């Protein structure tokens, strides 16, 4: 039966459905334009670029100061599918620099809180939260679907794992980090640019690298680093990434920006020899819950000698430390845990039986 519209116009049912669908498309287009209008008029983005973002998937590994800011920017830019992976919970010390969280989020999983806030910020996108430790057993399954991966981690072990996954599966990713008043960013395109291990062949010995917990961090630098990293991720998604390999270093206190050329290592074990040792189960850290002791032992897979006296000097500013030439004992006055660290990197974390909590403590105070 024909439908009679205003002004006496007749329309068949099939034509009516077409009109409804057309009207829906117009409304949807208006909605998208209203949300993304400032990006759509950019010659670097435009309608084709915005469509590409909406059909893209990005995973953010780590939801600390850098990762949460990158996630926020990607969601508001309209990346269609986001996945955030983080094993930790929101702590009071996070609020100084992790702008996605507030006091009402304390003790909640970071990935869960972040995903809920991003859904409220942009209901047009899909956001997945994975409250897990990224490790060699799950990394390929978790990261394998992404078009781009953004680094928001706090330790080199996980970064080397991400580098292995991305190189093996040819997934572009953006390495970044911030500590003190400076940060660095390097976009990595498998088969095009050097990989992370061309730049850093091996994980530095435990206790050598600075961490935010030991060196501090000015809350402005993670936001700047995340903005640069997110821009690099968007360029990759749009096929407009730079083809020359570069490491971007920014010091927010001195207001200096450097770009360093990174050269591919012709003997790189990862991107040249295809040795993905951080995906090798035989080479992963050994983590053991100690029976009857309310403690977890962590034995690093890679041998190294920790400078206990130097690390003790750093830890002394934030807790109680005792050390000799063989061991270091550290007590955090704000928590119940106690860490005994040995020269070879082995540690016993007392006050928890949770392997993930122990790994988090180890990564925080014994930088890797």
Give the predicted meaning of each segment.
Residues 2-7, 11-368:
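Adenine nucleotide-associated cytosolic modules
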């Amino acid at each position: 039966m024909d439908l009679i519209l205003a002004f006496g116009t007749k329309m068949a049912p099939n034509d009516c459905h077409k009109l409804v669908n057309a009207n829906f498309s117009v409304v949807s287009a208006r909605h998208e334009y209203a949300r993304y209008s400032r990006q759509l008029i950019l010659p670097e983005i435009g309608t084709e670029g915005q469509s590409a973002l909406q059909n893209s998937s990005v995973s953010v590994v780590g939801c600390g100061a850098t990762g949460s800011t990158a996630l926020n920017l990607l969601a508001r830019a309209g990346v269609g599918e986001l996945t955030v992976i983080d094993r930790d919970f929101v702590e009071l010390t996070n609020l100084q620099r992790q702008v996605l969280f507030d006091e009402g989020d304390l003790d909640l999983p970071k990935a869960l809180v972040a995903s809920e806030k991003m859904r409220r910020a942009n209901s047009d996108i899909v956001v997945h939260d994975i409250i897990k430790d990224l490790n060699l057993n799950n990394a390929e399954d978790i990261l394998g679907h992404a078009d781009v991966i953004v680094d928001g981690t706090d330790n080199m072990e996980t970064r080397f794992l991400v580098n292995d996954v991305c190189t093996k599966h040819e997934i572009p990713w953006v390495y970044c980090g911030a500590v003190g008043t400076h940060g660095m960013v390097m976009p990595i395109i498998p088969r095009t640019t050097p990989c992370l291990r061309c730049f850093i062949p091996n994980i530095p010995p435990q206790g050598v690298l600075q961490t935010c917990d030991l060196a501090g961090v000015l809350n402005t630098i993670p936001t700047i680093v995340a903005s640069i990293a997110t821009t690099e991720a968007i360029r990759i998604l749009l096929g407009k990434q730079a083809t020359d390999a570069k490491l971007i270093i920014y010091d927010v206190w001195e207001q200096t920006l450097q770009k360093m050329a990174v050269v591919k290592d012709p003997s790189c074990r990862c991107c040249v020899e295809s040795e993905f040792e951080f995906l090798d189960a035989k080479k992963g850290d050994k983590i053991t819950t100690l029976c009857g002791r309310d403690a977890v032992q962590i034995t690093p897979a890679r041998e190294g000698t920790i400078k206990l006296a130097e690390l003790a000097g750093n830890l002394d500013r934030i807790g109680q430390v005792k050390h000799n030439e063989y061991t270091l004992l550290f007590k955090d006055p704000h928590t119940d845990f106690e860490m005994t660290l040995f020269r070879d990197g082995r540690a016993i974390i007392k006050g928890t039986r949770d392997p993930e909590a122990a790994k988090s403590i180890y990564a925080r105070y014994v930088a890797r």
